[in-house]
Amino acid sequence: MENPFEITAVVAREILDSRGNPTVEVEVYTPISMGRAAVPSGASTGTHEALELRDGGKRYHGKGVRRAVENVNKIIAPELIGMDVTWQRDIDTLMLELDGTENKSNLGANAILGVSLAVAKAAANALGLPLYQYIGGTNAYVMPVPMSNVINGGVHAGNELDFQEFMIMPVGADSFREAIRWVSETYHVLKKVIAEKYGKDAINVGDEGGFAPPMKEVTEPLETLIKAIEEAGYKPGDEIALAIDAASSEFYHPDIGKYVVAGKEYTREELVDLYKELVSAYPIVSIEDPFQEEDWEGFKLITRELGGKIQIVGDDLFVTNPKRIRKGIEMGAANALLLKVNQIGTLSEAIDAAYTAFRAGYGVVVSHRSGETEDATIADLAVALNAGQIKTGAPARSDRNAKYNQLIRIEEELEGIAHYPGRKFRNPFF
């Protein structure tokens, strides 16, 4: 008798992401289901991330992924045919063994992740379960508070802002649907505020749907956001709070051993003082990557100084890697993890990273990358983990709204039991 959960085919192809660059899409088939997943790609990448395999050469300016696609079709697929699609961890472990490297540089993290996520989706579909419930079980019910990146700087923009992202968080909303309405309304007012001050050229949107007006001083976007929140009819801090992704690796100058913000040099201690000034002047509740990816002492210092008051998120510091997360926990560096599935390369390892963080009392922010697709897996993952937070761009561009729309559907499915944590986003159960 045919096993309905047996993998019958694994097919990979090259598709385009939101930046028009190639990425990997994978389909996994069983006799009764199919799962499809597409892999995202980052612009500001941590040195310790799992390796994304690109072809090089002239085709797609070297960014083709035919090698990764071939690795799925020729190497991974034959090994998976006949396996039970619900054996997620076994399948992920097998792919790690097939690759045989620490950073997945042999087969490519983009090949392995595409298969890993497609396997989970095919299994969920075979069982007739929504993906968040398949991954998280019956206890998956916490909706995430959106961290919406509405003003861009750094490598995401062509302006002079050194900090990469300025975000709004609707902490005073009662539900996800209400939260996303507040974000959308504020975003549209922000567009008007920026156009009035900086002109129409300043309201073109970046990779993640945010605006990149010609600002330089870090206080400019914060002042602009406060104005937009108030004009949209909301209270800054009480209803909509602010968050920053400094992405400090991008403005650290190793030749002088200092950080350069708006043309001014800062030592580690001086940069902590700048963050403290910003937190006391504005309703900032979260700062991501306040120091460069190897500045463990800087993270330790800011966590000691501000960690009792706000969330300190490690992205490039941790790169979703359980070993680096454990080091941070031991040192008291940061108090939250930015979870990007493509930094580590399999669903099982991403879940392990999240639970390593949770067990230490750290928060977890499930995150997109700047190069995305219509794939909305991270929306389901945020609910599956009860993470309480998601970072997936401005409420603009279909690649970002695909995630928000999926969360609206999930909240509707969980009618009566869905919990929106609001201000308790870092520890939604306490």
Curated annotation (Swiss-Prot):
Its cofactor is Mg(2+). GO terms for cellular component: cell surface; extracellular region; phosphopyruvate hydratase complex. (2R)-2-phosphoglycerate binds at Q164, K340, R369, S370, K391. Its EC number is 4.2.1.11. Mg(2+) binds at D245, E288, D315. GO terms for molecular function: magnesium ion binding; phosphopyruvate hydratase activity. The active site is at E208 (proton donor), K340 (proton acceptor). Binds a second Mg(2+) ion via substrate during catalysis. One of its GO terms (biological process) is glycolytic process. SMART domains: Enolase_C, Enolase_N. Pathway: Carbohydrate degradation; glycolysis; pyruvate from D-glyceraldehyde 3-phosphate: step 4/5. Its main location: cytoplasm. Keywords: Cytoplasm, Glycolysis, Lyase, Magnesium, Metal-binding, Secreted. It is found in: Cytoplasm; Secreted; Cell surface. Belongs to the enolase family. Catalyzes the reversible conversion of 2-phosphoglycerate (2-PG) into phosphoenolpyruvate (PEP). It is essential for the degradation of carbohydrates via glycolysis. NCBIfam families: eno. This is Enolase. It comes from Thermococcus onnurineus (strain NA1).
